[in-house]
Design a protein with these regions (language model features):
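Extended alpha-helical targeting/anchoring segments
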Residues: 1-516
Length: 516
């Protein structure tokens, strides 16, 4: 019988602070490989819950078919030692120093396999699955948080004839952290808990010392974020004439039946030396169900996303997709305030727009198909249809599709089957993704991927990376797309991308000009 791996989890109450960016500034600003996840209620905009991954024991990074595991401390070295034998059976393992870091090269997936065989094959998702399964018996589930990039999908779909230009941006296909210290905050009850995960018997004293240090620092929160002046000049990779040209060219592919709907996008870039302050401003301006700040060694990613990517609850095995498609700008008056009458008129216009309805229903149908691929027969249903959610600059049509995951599959199988979400690609999905690469001619990096977490009891909660900034070398890249169908107006689609990028651009510009 296999020995149960050692794990000791301590949990202690810590002082509650409503301002999670101040906590992050105090505990994590100097730590790469840290993550902040916030959530707010859609209607009231009140804060709900927050998770702060303060420091990690192991970093797991995927690029192409290679997954690299790096121990960030002695606690993490024990994890690597224990998972190495399992991973060596799934792929080719290589390392300079096995104690600190090793890589696993997985065989490329055979695209001729049927759907179920693809899901059962060893893939790069096993990099996360092996760790999660290793600690599945832990009474307190271990926590893996991070990013799935959009371009992870290129390992799973035919890419013949697609050539992408180097845009100077580097982003792994996925980057996840195995939490060593994690704060969970319930804003409704105003309670906070620090959980510390020790994976090595020899490191229990050291892990306890770190936890004590964190608890002490929480008594003196530093909410002052330093701000540097910066330009608020915005550039884009496709100006309006070029972008409307892409929309027109894609319309040909809709006409000939290659796709019914597709989501071209473009990127807006500006200086962003004040990432945490910009995130705090975005939270203030545009509270959303999924807000995130990821401090990676290679990049910083922050955003306020309205849209769940994939959500899975192991207690009832419910899988959920929350398609958002169809939008209108909010109804502002001449002074920049919401005019309720104009806002209501724009909502009515959105609800009655046949193009928006058609686009939305196509994507609900695509979500139903995605759910059906991995769920038990007869369990799929549309739980909510065409509701309206409001955000600071934009309103959306939303629906919710659910199903019961098949017993032999887990949430990572479901993500593999469903990526990338139809609201960021189109339908049919694989052809739409191939056309997107063909016309955009570059990687999307984090945009359209997913950020969130996986726990060792199987829970999975991710949002689509939209309304977000990917920051590298001091430059923020904000990408936004538009849902194109046969009767789309190219200029209106270009305008839609600006509306969607507006909240993040505004937050960064507000901070950049504050210090002047």
């Amino acid at each position: 019988m296999k020995n149960t791996p050692f794990i000791a989890v301590t949990s202690q109450p810590v002082p509650y602070h409503a301002d999670t960016t101040a906590i992050f500034n105090t505990l994590c600003q100097q730590n790469s490989n840290s993550l902040l996840l916030d959530s707010a209620e859609i209607g009231s905009k009140n804060s709900l819950q927050s998770l702060i991954l303060i420091n990690a024991a192991v970093k797991i990074t995927c690029l192409g078919n290679q997954v690299t595991f790096r121990a960030l401390n002695a606690n993490g070295k024990q994890v690597l030692k224990e998972i190495h034998p399992v991973l060596s059976q799934l792929g080719t393992v290589s390392a300079v120093n096995f104690d600190n870091e090793f890589s696993v090269q997985f065989a490329p997936l055979d695209n001729q396999l049927d759907e179920d065989s693809k899901l059962q094959a060893a893939t790069i998702f096993d990099g996360l699955r092996v760790i999660s399964n290793h600690y599945q018996h832990s009474s307190t589930p271990v926590f893996l948080g991070g990013l799935f990039a959009y371009d992870l999908v290129a390992n799973f779909i035919p890419m013949q004839g697609v050539e992408l230009k180097d845009d100077g941006i580097t982003c792994p296909d996925y980057s996840f952290y195995l939490a060593e210290n994690l704060i969970t905050i319930d804003h409704q009850s105003q309670q906070a808990t620090l959980k510390s995960f020790c994976f090595s018997q020899e490191e229990q004293v050291e892990v306890a010392k770190t936890a004590l240090s964190i608890a002490q620092k929480l008594k003196n929160i530093d909410g002052v974020l330093s701000i540097k002046a910066a330009s608020d000049e915005i550039s884009t990779n496709f100006e309006d004439p070029e972008f409307t040209g892409i929309v027109k060219a894609l319309k040909h592919h809709i006409n000939i039946g290659d796709v019914f709907q597709i989501v071209p996008s473009r990127r807006f870039s500006l200086a962003c030396p004040n990432t945490l302050a910009s995130y705090a401003q975005l939270k203030l301006n545009n509270p959303s169900p999924y807000m995130f700040y990821m401090n990676d060694e290679e990049f910083i990613l922050f955003g306020a996303s309205p849209e769940s990517a994939l959500k899975y609850a192991p207690d009832n095995r419910q899988l959920e997709i929350y398609p958002i498609a169809g939008s209108r700008p909010r109804g502002f008056d001449a002074h920049g305030n919401i005019d309720p009458e104009l806002d209501a008129r724009l909502e009515l216009e959105l609800r009655l727009d046949h193009k928006e309805q058609a686009e939305h229903l196509m994507l609900v149908d695509l979500a139903r198909n995605d759910i059906a691929r991995v769920c038990q027969s007869g369990t799929r249903k549309v739980a909510e249809l065409m509701q309206v959610d409001r955000y600071s600059h934009i309103m959306h049509l939303v629906s919710r599709v659910v199903g019961k995951l098949r017993p032999e599959l887990d949430a990572l199988h479901a993500y593999q089957a469903c990526m990338n979400m139809g609201t960021l690609t189109g339908a049919p999905k694989i052809k739409a993704m191939q056309l997107i690469y063909q016309f955009e001619q570059q990687k999307r990096h984090s945009y359209g991927g997913a950020v969130g977490y996986l726990t060792s009891d199987g829970r999975f909660d991710t949002c689509i990376v939209i309304r977000s900034a990917f920051v590298q070398n001091g430059i923020a890249h904000i990408q936004a797309g538009c849902g194109e169908v046969l009767d789309s107006d190219p200029q209106m689609e270009a305008d839609e991308t600006r509306h969607k990028a507006a909240a993040v651009l505004k937050a960064i510009k507000q901070i950049n000009t504050q210090a002047k």
